[in-house]
Amino acid sequence: MSSSKRSQSSGRSSTQTRIQNRVTQASADAKLSTAFEVSSSSGGDSFDYTKSVTASLNPTEPLAAKSVTAYLQRMQRGSIIQSFGCMMAVEPGTFRIIAYSENVSEMLGVTPQSVPTGDHQNAIGIGTDVRSLLSPSSVSVVEKAVAANDVSMMNPIAVYSLATQKLFFAILHMNDVGLVIDLEPISSSSDSAMFSAGAVQSHKLAAKAISRLQSLPGGDICGLCDVVVEEVRELTGYDRVMAYKFHDDEHGEVVAEIRRSDLEPYLGLHYPATDIPQASRFLFIKNRIRMICDCTSPQVKVVQDSRIPQEMSLAGSTMRGVHGCHTQYMMNMGSTASLVMSVTINDTNEIAGGPGMKGRKLWGLIVCHHSTPRHIPFPIRSACEFLMQVFGLQLNMEVELAAQHREKHILRTQTLLCDMLLRDAPMGIVSQSPNVMDLVKCDGAALLFGGRCWLLGISPTQEQVKDIATWLISSHTDTTGLSTDSLVDAGYPKARELGVDVCGMAAARITENDFLFWFRGHAQKEVKWAGAKDGGSEEDGSRMHPRSSFKAFLEVVKQRSLPWEDVEMDAIHSLQLILRGSFQDIEDKEDRKIVHARLKEMHLQGMEELSSVASEMVRLIETATAPILAVDTAGCVNGWNFKISELTGLSIPEVMGKSLVKDLTHPSSKDTVEKLLYMALNGEEEQNVEIRLKTWGMQQGKGPVILMVNACASRDVSEKVVGVCFVAQDVTGEKIVQDKFTRIQGDYTTIVRSHNSLIPPIFGSDESGFCVEWNPAMERLSGVKREEAIGKMLTRELFGGILRLKNVDGLTKFMIVLNAAMSSHDTDKFPFTFYDRSGKIVEVLLTTSKRCNSEGVVTGVFCFLHTASSELQQALTVQKAAERVAEVKAKELAYIRQEIQNPLDGIHFARSFMEHTVLSEDQKQLIETSATCEKQLRRILADMDLASIEKGYLELETGEFSMATVMNSVVSQGMIQSTQKNLQLYCDTPPDFKSLSVFGDQVRLQQVLADFLLNAVQFTPPSGWVEIKVEPVVKKLPGGVSVANVDFRVSHPGEGLPEDLIDQMFDRADARVKSQEGLGLSICRKLVRLMNGEVQYRREGERNFFLLQLELPLAQRDDQASMK
């Protein structure tokens, strides 16, 4: 099956493509089924499997929609079941039988109504009350199950035949006409024992397998699949167990296998999509586990009420019949029995697989085969189904992690390609390393630009590439590109001339006639071969068999490459946009000046707002009703709010500087706190960890304070960890009650059912998963009354039924926690989210503990919920909001910082070009001034660590420079604003100033003087003046070192800078009210201090001035003693 589409974003287009592919595939499935049926009716010798698969995919011979619909109906509504059990369908209200399998009378020991008998009570037929066929105790169990919100969650239930007292597993589900009851005989005492403890007990059968899955290291999907097939084989005992993965183009591959040593291996084989028809895939989502006990056993017909308009759906039945083509396939591969389990993961494109499955997709199947008849009891199948849910969770995490790693690789490659474009556009992306072939997986690539062609890897010739471009321009005039896994199917006339080395192509249109291409060869060379490739006879391809399926797959992909994935097309589309942008002309100089000014404005404004957010956060932390503390990298306290002070009895001045571990932590928690600190300082933040702190003063007699803490690494703007902040919740009262409860063990009623506010929400279940405890706090939290909750199943009926969960994964994780507690593995502080009766989301921490009787036997589970106080929730909400504001501003600054780099590079290129031309002295000075201004701007852009400036840790870049160069740059930065205000700008320097060279940080000095000058210009009345005067005095120090003590005066008339602005400059004002100008002046003052200088702002009569005093080492040792 081919996929060709115009280049666009992957979201909606991907969904539409996948839907179209599935519709096309369903038609191919129907054609193949029709061919088999025609062959069977004529004796069966004319059916060639490989050729039929290839023919079914021929788009020139479409099947009528009516025929496809009829095929799908047969797949879901075939009126046959397997013979290992029997089936009845009844009306839910009356229990009147409306359909039954013909073997019911034999299995239940009753007489068909068609046989004359005097005992009509033990006869079965349409209209019979099913309750008359079961024992009285069985009837009550069935009636209770039918009353449940979801009958399937009660499976299995034990029922006895009234006539023979034979025991059956009854598996119930609803379909479109009524209640379907599948009856499977319980053949041994072990089967009965497995049932006696209910569904929860059956899940315990998978406890070891689940524990092993959860203990595996991340990042290895193949290893995960290997383990799951091993564990399924141990649970079920089948000869062969395989993990079968569906690829994006719907074909399948065996990715893991464990088998009997004498069986032929199938690991690595690929299969065409028709091997698992779309209708079967739907059924695998509807009924996630499918067992065939004996494919050679005769099928049993289903008799149904003539008033039912069509054949009854058996999609949800455990005994759905086996179609002839599948029977033949199994027999050809030497298999008699099979067990197939579906594996679902999250679907980001949200194509629903069926009711209740929105957002899930079928990743693949776990397939088991056995050479002799084999029946697996329902409890073991239920355990396997639960194992598949856990496997799906683990697999989903691995798939998402792999996707993240892939996206990061693509982003890194895009960044490198962008850098190459700046140096050598556009040829750099094909002539340097890495190149465009590193962006996505491909065999070759080509760039067609300006009539020239650059080729990489295995690609068409230059003439062929130009011909493809001509075809795209003429045949796809309204698109920006094309992606296809088959140029033949896409309609390129000369596709077959390219051979098997070029089958698939992704093309990105850059301009009207310029393109970037990626090419892929045929998919066959990507296939991992397994077993003998040519050991079979010529006729093997005609028989339905895994090897012939593989041969059919190779035939299907002969002129086709692997499909282009959505993430790859997104990467190509992004590079296409970047390339288009790189061809645009650089904006004119005036626009660049505007951008530079906007950059500086945004830079300072962002600093101001971030500073304001930080100050607000400090105030919030200090006044929060939740205990919050912070430590530096040495583990010493540098933050301690009023709430933690109240709980411990230790005031803020008393605690500052003390060691959290040595001085404040209770001995029982020292190891925990040390580990918590170590991990947080290394960037690994732990949540919901219990610690105990010592108490002092009036609190000392109450014992240690018990806190549930989240550790957050504190970072500076360069992402360096500078400490740890602990946001906590006081759980001392809850813990005392919980400990007391645990000690009592027996008579707990007075505690659990108390209305005391210190009692946390508590609920419990028996060993079968039914609710046996639901305390008042749980009633208040959930909105569900105790009398309504007691007796209901915790999973699916309470949680997942009345109380909705966020998704299917949430229910699976909850079931894992409950089953772990039943196996004596308690869980502490597990994050748990559900919706209460009114639909409000509830986020809690779940702690489980096993319930034991007086003999120590586990009889159920107790669950404790820890809820955050309203004050803490409010504090966290405010914190998240503040963090979002800070993050938005930081991103905006990062964007501006990134976007300004390109025009800066353009300026740099223009200046570098001009430097190599013949220039006058004045022109050389202008070029030099431009270079110093550019250098200053780049340094400001790189300023990410404002905290280092604040604390005096910034590292200066010292070098030799000319003072005259600095002054020229400073004056040039003030010229435009001075001219706009009609100001006279003077620069007063001594005669020998041009020859003065010193050591220091030229860019930082430039930055400071320019900022002082521009502030003076801003606060000078129109038509006034501004003067910058330099007075250097050279001194010779012992040791022959000469220094220049330099006074810089930036003077201006008028009222001068406002007092509040001066207060901001000298940090005498509240940081939250700092203006843009105040923040800039404050940073400049701190930069001066870093250079061991001093700065003042003075008022003398009608003159105001900044006075900057610096001592700078001279570059020459033999300068004159004075230049004044």
Swiss-Prot record:
Residue ranges, compositional bias (Low complexity): 1-18
Single GO MF descriptor: photoreceptor activity
Domain PAS: 613-684, 747-818
GO biological process, one term: regulation of DNA-templated transcription
Residues binding phytochromobilin, per UniProt: C325
InterPro entries, sorted: GAF, GAF-like_dom_sf, HATPase_C_sf, His_kinase_dom, HisK_dim/P_dom, PAS, PAS-assoc_C, PAS-like_dom_sf
Renumbered residue ranges of the record's region Disordered: 1-27
Gene3D superfamilies from the UniProt entry: 3.30.450.270, 3.30.450.40, Histidine kinase-like ATPase, C-terminal domain, PAS domain
Start and end residues of each PAC domain: 687-743
Top-level taxon of the source organism: Eukaryota
NCBIfam families: sensory_box
Subunit structure and binding partners: Homodimer.
Family of this protein: Belongs to the phytochrome family.
The protein's name in its UniProt record: Phytochrome
Origin species: Mougeotia scalaris (Green alga)
